[in-house]
């Protein structure tokens, strides 16, 4: 992806980015936070819609691991808006496994990268826009964030890690 646009009509926030051109919120340049330690990071996630016991166990295992290894965890509803939250420093990191599809993450991926962040698969592998799995973070905590999540296996109702 080379262009990203995310608009929140309730707050009138327009996030935009073009590859190589920086990231913006309502025409003001934005950048990711500079938090350097996972233990000080504010993390966003979403719980998803699968309710089989094994998938719920995997989800709650990841949430527990994040609660134990970050400052705090938030669930606020939108993959794209959470990614923009990372891009502007409202969040230090975000991950979601099992969102709807590329429309939920492609624009956010461009915006986060142009704001100085990283976008990966939660396993640490390369981000796949069709994989329905995303992790984004400021440039300092990405690998520590992956380390926390990678210890918890995926649930059977979730898109699986790349091979």
Task: Please provide the spans of the model-predicted regions.
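Small-residue (primarily alanine) positions within well-ordered alpha-helices
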Residues: 4, 23, 108, 115-117
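Acidic donor-binding loop at a coil-to-helix junction in glycosyltransferase catalytic cores
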Residues: 103
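Acidic, metal-binding active-site segment of PIN/NYN-like and related structure-specific nucleases
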Residues: 116-132
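Acidic beta-strand-loop-alpha-helix segment within the catalytic core
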Residues: 1-83, 132-163
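Paired acidic/hydrophobic, glycine-rich loop segments that form the ligand-binding mouth/hinge
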Residues: 92-96, 119-121
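Hydrophobic residues within well-ordered alpha-helices
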Residues: 85-89, 107-114
């Amino acid at each position: 992806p080379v262009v990203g646009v995310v608009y929140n009509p309730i707050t009138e926030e327009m996030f935009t980015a073009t590859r190589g051109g920086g990231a913006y919120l309502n025409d003001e340049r934005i950048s990711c936070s500079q938090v350097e330690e996972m233990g000080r990071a504010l993390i966003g996630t979403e719980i998803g819609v699968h309710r089989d016991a094994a998938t719920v166990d995997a989800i709650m295992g990841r949430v527990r691991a994040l609660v134990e290894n970050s400052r705090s965890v938030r669930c606020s509803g939108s993959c794209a808006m959470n990614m923009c939250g990372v891009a502007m420093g409202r969040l230090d990191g975000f991950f979601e496994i099992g969102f709807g599809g590329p429309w939920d993450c492609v624009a956010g991926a461009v915006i986060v990268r142009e704001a100085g962040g990283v976008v990966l698969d939660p396993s640490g592998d390369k981000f796949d826009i069709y994989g329905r799995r995303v992790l984004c973070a400021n440039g300092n905590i990405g690998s520590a964030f992956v380390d926390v999540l990678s210890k918890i296996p995926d649930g059977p109702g979730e898109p699986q890690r790349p091979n």
